[in-house]
Amino acid sequence: MPDLDDPCPTPVTRVQQNLLAASERRLLTWLCARMPNWVTPDLLTTIGMIGAVMVFAGYTASNLGDAWLWLAIGGYVVQWFGDSMDGSLARFRKVERPSFGYFIDHSCDGLANLLIMAGIGLSPFVRLDVALFALAGYLLLSIHAFLSVRVLGEMKLSYIAAGPTELRLILIALTLVMMAMGSTPGWFGDVSGFDLFIGGVGAILLLLFLVQTLVASRRLLAIGERD
């Protein structure tokens, strides 16, 4: 769920009710005011993608040793910085490119999410099919957000008080638990506790998509949209 500009010329309401939204916005505004001129939104988008590659590399390399997970944790920080700052800096400097920014940002988000979840699935801690199931749930919610912009004029950046930043913090905490517990078999044989956690998150995301789709459909019917 990105932080760039609205794709439509008509006003779009940004729905952002995650727990850290206000604190994060203050931090981003503080950082924007101190960014040197050579730091551009495009550079920050690139930095965000570099962070996603770091996460992928850290998880996949953890097959060689748990210490590589520190690279994944560092990648989350880099990815947050680039992904959160690119749109914020564009708006701060009033150099928005609404259509281009929206298209590139969401395209990069999709690739970054794939890198992160594929990395988790290629690690010794989580099965690939479980990680890809969670990715599917996240991408379905992203699709819902994109559709809401078009049909409701709303950009949903959070669900149940959680957004991308909260999800990154959860994944960082999970990665620290991976380092502490190792990749030994769990109580359920081939299915580890990490599989259950990631699979559970995926199930929640899928359920949220279904509920939000139902809610949006009822809203559209109420305002006379019957395509």
What are these language model-derived features?
Residues M1-I73, G119-D227:
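Hydrophobic alpha-helical transmembrane segments
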Residues G74-A118, H144-S148, L214-V215:
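Acidic (Asp/Glu-rich) catalytic motifs at the cytosolic membrane interface
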